[in-house]
Amino acid sequence: MKQNVERKIPDFDELLGLWSRSLIAFPDGVEDRETWVNWLQGPSIYLDLRQPPAGPTFHTVRGLRDLNEDQVLWLAEQEGFAGTLNFDGTYFEWRREIDFQPEAIYSDQGKLWVEEDKMVEEGKDIPYFEHWHSEPIGRAPVCAMRLESKADQVRGFLLRVGSLFMYARDRFVGFPESDSARGMHLRDYVAGAKDLHAAQDFVNCEISQGAITSAGWIIQRSTLPFRLAQNLMPELLAPAATLVTSDTSHDGRQARRSWDIIDIEGSTACIPGAEPARLVRQSFV
């Protein structure tokens, strides 16, 4: 007779780091093993990027306005989010403050447990199972920032764990609000946009992942293909409440973006220009 084995629920310290997904499976038998999915978890702040395989080429794209209709439609199939992870004793909830897709009808909640060489996630509001695998990137240093750009009223996040980072910058335009629009996919907004510029604006939400090397903070994956191989160049400015990062203008010119730091988790010593700081959580509001 098979005995029930108590599930090992991970704590936040065990979740710290990079997780890759190998499978999502639904009760009707539909599975996905092809989508590239990485989830980077900090002390509570997280970022997540999901990209479909076999996209079009973007070799001639220097900025947002270079994207053609087919490229925009493919970009609209991506997913990604940034926010904070919470746990109520039963369910983990990935609260999304930035979402590449329009706001979902259902919350992003699920159970997590460790099973042999993987971590399993079981959805709460939507029935699914996901298999996650811890990637060896190192667990220190750790620094996470919640950001706000007052110049254009957009939110952002920066998270470093070990030798890897993820960065998010919200879009500058909102989605049309109506009861009929609830639950729509980004591809629907893109397909129904009044012109190509409006469609481009809908996909102009950056969620990037990269590696920290001797050459800098080099972007290796991004929802915006023209950001690939660029150096994020984060710099913490005195009095340690302002962060500057690289950006790309709509026409492909290199630019710098200034952020107000709203919240910090971890040590700012791992951010260029920063004074060493102990591992603490700070808030500037």
Where are the model-predicted features located?
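Phosphoinositide-binding peripheral membrane targeting modules
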Residues: 83
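A short, structured loop/turn motif at beta-sheet edges
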Residues: 86-92
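Lipid interaction determinants
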Residues: 1-80, 92-285
